[in-house]
């Protein structure tokens, strides 16, 4: 089962929490969910060059707090904060609440699965050899402390007439282990031969305590890198 399911969805409530954090009754739930979808669509469209990996939406009383996880926070903020003010106004037009936008810097984008997948997709669009792009991403992740990484590329790779799937793995990626801290990201490359799909799994270690916020806490403390299992056992 762990081989097929989205590893983030499988671990929700165990060592990973939701990206939309709010409660609503039946009357408002659909409206707020639709607002979340529109907010994410607009932000991803406006911040294509900002390397946005994740958008977290929280709704305290009569407010909407949006946290943007980006590898290039300067692009999000803009000159003297002009760009972020425009984003705040656009989000405020969608929702009737007061909008607060926070930005979290991703210090090691090579260890973020979404950013790695998008980087490979961009290289495929520039006609870089897919094996070279995959190998370069794997080496960068392992050098910066990942315990394992797996990359799948599928489609008409290299302009081949028959679509196929190629994969590359280094280290261990235990998809069945629920305590494993596994990041997962997907991206699509729009090439002249058609679309190519990219999937990335990055194993950053094990989270021994049962805490849905554990992954977020470790990313904020360690810049995207989880402590090794040995150091966690010593601390316990």
From Swiss-Prot:
Residues in coiled coil: none
Keywords: Ribonucleoprotein, Ribosomal protein, RNA-binding, rRNA-binding
One Gene Ontology cellular component: cytosolic small ribosomal subunit
Recorded superkingdom: Bacteria
KH type-2 domain location: 39-107
SMART domains documented for this protein: KH
Annotated segments matching region Disordered: 213-236
PROSITE patterns in the cross-refs: KH_TYPE_2, RIBOSOMAL_S3
One of the record's GO molecular function terms: structural constituent of ribosome
Biological process (GO), any one: translation
UniProt-listed InterPro entries: KH_dom (IPR004087), KH_dom-like_a/b (IPR015946), KH_dom_type_2 (IPR004044), KH_sf_prok-type (IPR009019), Ribosomal_S3_C_sf (IPR036419), Ribosomal_uS3_bac-typ (IPR005704), Ribosomal_uS3_C (IPR001351), Ribosomal_uS3_CS (IPR018280)
This protein's record includes keyword Transmembrane: no
Subunit relationships: Part of the 30S ribosomal subunit. Forms a tight complex with proteins S10 and S14.
Stored PANTHER family: 30S/40S RIBOSOMAL PROTEIN S3, SMALL RIBOSOMAL SUBUNIT PROTEIN US3C
Role noted for this protein: Binds the lower part of the 30S subunit head. Binds mRNA in the 70S ribosome, positioning it for translation.
Membership in a protein family: Belongs to the universal ribosomal protein uS3 family.
Protein name in the entry: Small ribosomal subunit protein uS3
